[in-house]
Structures are given as C-alpha cells and as structure tokens.
Amino acid sequence: MIVICQPDHEIVDKAVEFSVIMNKTDFYFIFIPGETYEIINFLTGPGLGNRFTVNSFSIDLIPIDNDLISMEREGSFKQLYVDNDITPISDFVDSFIKLELCFGKIKHKYIKGERAKVFCDLLSKKEIETNIKTTEEIFGMIVFDRNVDFLTPMTSNFTYEGLFDEHFGIKWGNVYIEKSYFKIGVKEREKNQKDFYSLTSESNPFHSIIRCMHYLDVNNYMNQLRNYYIEIAQKSKDVTNLTDIQEAISSYKDYLTNYKNPIEISARFINKFIDENHKEDNKNYRVKESIFLSGVFPDNLKLFYDDYITDKKDLIKLLNLFIIETLTQGGVKDYNLLKRDILNIYGYQNIFLFRDLETIGLLKEKAVLKKLTETSYQQIVSKLNLISTDIDYKKTKVKDCSYIYQGYCPIILRLIELAVQGKWNKFKDIITKLPGESIFPEDETEIVKPKSDEQKVHTIFVVFVGGVSYNEIEGIRFINRNLKSIYDKSKDKSVGRIQLIIVTNEILNRKKIFNRLGKEFNQAFAFKKFYEDIEKEEGGKGKEKK
C-alpha cells in the first residue's frame, strides 16, 4: 500500500493504525514536500522498524501570486523552533539557488536573525559550487528569521486578506468556503458543499485591490463602487446613440465579470466580522492586546485572566494573549499559577502545547525586577515609532503601515521600510536589540541610488525563514503601493522604482501555529506490535517481561 501525504501527525497515526490492524508489511510513505526527522524516528522506532519504506517528493518554490513565492512546506515552523531541525533551511536553499541560476547572484543583502544567517551561509556555499555570476536582475534581498518578530503573526488581523485567511485558510492562493456561509436559502443537502474562490490578482482583480486595506476601509470602497455602477445604470436609461450604448454595456459586463460576485462575498464577510468584533468579549480582548502592543501593562489583567479561565473560554485565544504579554513584557506575571489553573480546568493533555510554546520562548514566567527599567520592547516601540495615535481612517492616502494595523506598525515592516530607505546603519543600535545577528551593506546608498541609469524596476526579495503570515504579506503589499520612484539628486532624474517580492518556505497564521504544536504521535499501536514481536520471539514469555 502506498500513502502519499504531507508529514502530518494525524495522517501518519491513522496509516500506522491501519497497517498494524490489517497486519500489512508492504507499506510505503511518500511525503510531500519532504519527511521530517520526527516522523522518521517514529516510523523506524520500536515495533515499526521494518514495516514502512519512506521516501519524499521534493517541491520547489511555487509562485502563489505575482509578488509572492512559497515552498508551502507545512510544519517547517515546528521543525525549526521546537525540534531545532534545520532541514527546512537546507531545502529552502536548494530551491532558492534555482532562482539565482535563472536571475543571477544577488549582491545586496540585509540579514537579521540566526536562522537567516544560516540560510545565507548555506546559500553562499551553493553559489560558489555552482559558480553563479552576480547580476542586478534581482537587485537585493532582505532576509529575516521568523523569531525576529514572533509578535505580528500572533496579533489580531485588520487587513481584509489577513482576516479572510484566519477564517477560511487560504491555500495556494485559493480558498474553499461552505455555500451556506455566504448564500441565503441553500438547500439542506448542499449546506456542507464548498465553493471554490481564487484570490490571485490575475483571477480576482477586485480582491487584489481590497486585500491590503483595513477592513473598515473595504466597506467604504465597496459603497463607492456600488454608487459608481448605479450611476452608470441610471445614465444608460437615457442613452440614444450607439457609442454610448456600447460603453454602457461594456461597463455593465465589467461589473458582472469582475465585481458583482466578489462585492457580495466581501460585503457579507465584512458584516459578519463587524458583528463578531462588536461582541463584548472580543472588545475586551482587543483592548488588552492594543495596550500590550503599546508597551504598557493593562489594568485588572489578573481578574480578566481568572474570569476567562473560570468560564472556560477559547484556550487558544487566551494563550495568544499570554504570548503577546511574554513578548512585550518579558514574561507572564504569575505564569506558573495560571498554567496550573489552565491544566486543571482545560485538561492535562494541553501540557504538550505548553511545553512547545515554552521551548520556542513564547511563554515564560516574568522575572521580578527590583528596579523599574524600560524594557527592550518599549525601547523598540519608541525608537522605531511603532505606535501611531492619530490615524484618520477617512483619509484615502495614508502611507504609514500602522494605518492597516489599528495604530501599530509591525516590527518587521518597519525594518523593511528602513532597508529600502538605506537606514539600517542609522538605527543599528536599536536593531541589535532584536533577536539574532544583524548584517547589512557597508554602503547603503547603493540601495537608495542604484548605479544603473535605466528607468527600470529594481526587484528586492523579502525572504522569511520560518514562515510569513498574511498579516505581514498585506503590510508588504501596502509598502509596495507607497514606494516612490528612486530619485538621484546628482543626476536630477528618476532611476526607476523598487518592487518587493516575498519569498518564504511557509505561509502561516496563529491558528496554523497552534494546530502544529503540542502534537504527539500515537505510540499505542507501535508498542502493541513491539510486545507482540517479543512474545513470538520468546515463546510467550513476553507477557511476564511486560
């Protein structure tokens, strides 16, 4: 029997259970895009060692959209940060080198984080082995280790596509949604059926316009669009000549083809989210989150936690707020007491989830400080100007990233802005406070003023080792929209513009992160077979040994 699957705990458990029950020994696993050490150790462990043949089918970087390339290597986050397995980095480099074989060696590099440095070191070795020549086809790249900013994937989504991904799970630029979610009067037999929607810029022009907007702004835009087409429809009633009739028909056809269905879907989704967002529990949660992000400790937090645990509300949401407190305050106050209460009420099966989150460094007890000092996070917020209190959502041309994140600019997005402006050296003292090594060009003016005189697009790869969230993808798209032409004062002319393209080994969100942590293989069938083998070998004496 051949099983072709992703390296997923549940799939492997079911396959092992089936093979042991059916007593099948000719069992083949083909993992896409590759196996993990954890799975290999399990399948070759006690009782299972000779039952399975394991192989993998490698997948290279895949263009998800015109500005997004991903390996879609699910599980790489856990491998890198829980298992300390750098196989995903090695696979990522093997795929990335193929891009350089096509476009040439990338000269200018900004690197932040330990795993980002490992990626670039392995890439440099591959470049020497393959003798790739340096070109300016890809002008530069900014490489981040995911742990430079664990905070952003854990914060609430406010961009349209970020919300869409969190609710439905975008895969390969597409999404499947149950018919009953958007459509009224769906027949009973069709309620569980799903409709397919493509969200790429080519297949869904309307979605490509609204995806990096703040969700409140999407409502305004849809109303403007509706009014525009209503106005066209009214004018078409008085049309008399053939040319005007053709224009009216063309506009209506454009509306039916590109806008009618997406507008209806977006309107219903946004209205559902606004209703959900206005619930008292969600309001309180977001208030606490926003206070943490500003670097301040919220009032009555212990009471909020106690009530939340007592009422046995959503555990993932609670742990998410713990993580935000850990990353902004240096730890959770009374963490061990809260952890004990959670395990008592929610169940001790969650101890594995706590273990993994603690291993990564996302949960820990806050140290008791004798003297109150400004935390590293507070310094970062202040120096990088991450909080904006004067956001006006009625303005149509807001250029600061904090606009689409309810007043908070994610750390990584600010670092990207500084890189394309050639200002990492200016802010190096505060950048070094972030996890991992910082490496950037000695002469940053080459980034701001390319030597080429041609009017061209200067492409910069933004590389995420360990995954990127749609929360951040939409922020980078927002930066892309606001990047001005590169102007050289000495020559008094524009020398092109910068275009950012995102490259990663996995697209993730906070739900996916939690779903992949705290998972253990079901050892029951493995040990059952192990003891059966002992009994056969020793003529039934295995029971006494057991």
Language model features with spans:
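Extended, well-folded catalytic/binding cores that form a central cleft or groove in large enzyme
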Residues: 1-546
